[in-house]
UniProtKB/Swiss-Prot annotation:
Cofactor: [4Fe-4S] cluster
Short name of one Pfam family: ThiC_Rad_SAM
Protein name: Phosphomethylpyrimidine synthase
Phylogenetic placement of the source organism: Bacteria, Pseudomonadati, Pseudomonadota, Gammaproteobacteria, Vibrionales
Organism: Vibrio campbellii (strain ATCC BAA-1116)
HAMAP family associated with the record: ThiC
Recorded GO MF terms: 4 iron, 4 sulfur cluster binding; carbon-carbon lyase activity; zinc ion binding
Amino acid sequence: MSSRKQARLEAKQFIDTLSVQPYPNSSKVYVEGSRPDIRVPMREISLADSLIGGTKEAPIFEPNEPVRVYDTSGVYTDPEHTIDLYNGLPKLREGWIEERSDTELLDEVSSVYTKERLEDETLDDLRYGNLPRIRRAKDGQCVTQLHYARQGIITPEMEYIALRENMGRAQYRDEVLNQQHPGQSFGANLPKDITAEFVRKEVAEGRAIIPSNINHPESEPMIIGRNFLVKVNANIGNSSVTSSIEEEVEKLVWATRWGGDTVMDLSTGRNIHETREWILRNSPVPIGTVPMYQALEKVNGVAENLNWEVMRDTLIEQAEQGVDYFTIHAGLLLRYVPMTAKRVTGIVSRGGSIIAKWCLAHHQESFLYTHFREICEICAKYDVAISLGDGLRPGSVADANDEAQFAELRTLGELTKVAWEYDVQVIIEGPGHVPMHMIKENMEEQLEHCHEAPFYTLGPLTTDVAPGYDHITSGIGAAMIGWYGCAMLCYVTPKEHLGLPNKEDVKVGMITYKLAAHAADLAKGHPGAQVRDNALSKARFEFRWEDQFNLSLDPDTARAFHDETLPQESGKVAHFCSMCGPKFCSMKISQEVREYAKDTEQVAADQAISIKMLDDPLEGMRQKSQEFRDTGSELYHPAAYAEVSD
């Protein structure tokens, strides 16, 4: 069997047999809002008790508070739910949408292309079988979260988001968990407690968006904005040469398990429509697309043959399926194309290159630009956010921050104001390849010219010498621009520039970018961002190995790396790891010095002797070393200790 067929078979088996897969030592908890149907999921990580004294026979333990973390995995990690990918996820937001009474159910789909696909019996085996009815705004109504926010309405989605962003941090009482360094926020407004009113205000002023198509009620509300947690997008999608519907659904579930806040389906191969339907019906996170890719497929890949009619039908098709945000490359103008002539890598954006080719072939501005107001009208009927694409982003560090890139950025700022006239939510896409010392300028230019609309960047990659490791070079840039104020980071996988990512590549890209986003939150001083770090550091110092694994971004890999060299069960309670071994573990020695100093200080006080030598850490180390050799060093807790701690 070929590797292609094998991959598809394995993915099909995954879909057919998928069951709930909770994280290790974690439970799904729900925080309730002001009404019973607002239940916000979080992952609660249970921790072992800390040994604080006593004897081997009668140890004294102190409990550690469980730690709650942001959870994007949906019901796929909820033991109370039965997974059935053929019937999709629960329609969480359906009741909220219906009670607003500003939408209506359609008797049939509006897109000509969708009608053709539904009538094609050869697609029956591929088609998602439980198709929902289509919903659209009633005549004269606008159904966007931006519209509601500007009317002063706090929607259930906004309350849900406020609870989600706070992550229950008010419950922590441990001083160790609550300590946090002040950050440098570069002007971001980071309140200690996020309220539903704060969410409404940020959305109303265009500084944040809530991607929430009325035809994707399965999605759990989330927010993108620089005054909130930095988010991460995962790209999936087939190509003309590889992948299948089963594999893309598998990637979706995998990406959300590892922290994907949104997912973009960038499919460019066969059966794009059917692939997207499967993804939407099973996605707990917002789904984005680049409609241009499918429009190009409809004209057999000939860019010059694209036109507004094809594009319009594609937008309606995808909006009625439930796509939450569209990447629209409307800012690439005809006069900007010559600016790229002397670039090292020219135009590297797929969407950008398509538009540039069309503009040159017709010698006029693209239909995305000339029909932008009509695009906004379509988006307003379904609450599809617009992600204004950077078709002229630099594809090499040599081209960073050039005339073409910033000319397009200014046009994106102008289009942002147009979209806001229609109460359509907007985010701005950014680079790309930018060396570290030039990253901050990108954030400053975007804030100035795009009126503080959320920024969403691909990296940026800080060097061009890392094929196979572009997730690392881009993760560096992502952490920096996230710190400066970027609201969402688009992940890069190890396969960037080399091939279509597989399931494992998706995980590596996600973990790398969750790390970058978290580092940015810490640097900004986002309230509560340090709780997880503090909990893990405390577990590390106390040799609570299982807690270290479970608090990490990737418990499976952390555990595997540890067990690779210390596989025995005794290794789980060892006071060292294979990096330093028993004689050179800094934390073990530090613990011993701390205990010795505490004991000696007490003796010194009782006997009224000088304790000057205690101020000399070397003297303390020498004395402790002698004691260590005289009494022998016990490297493991006895089994009884382990049983009690468990």
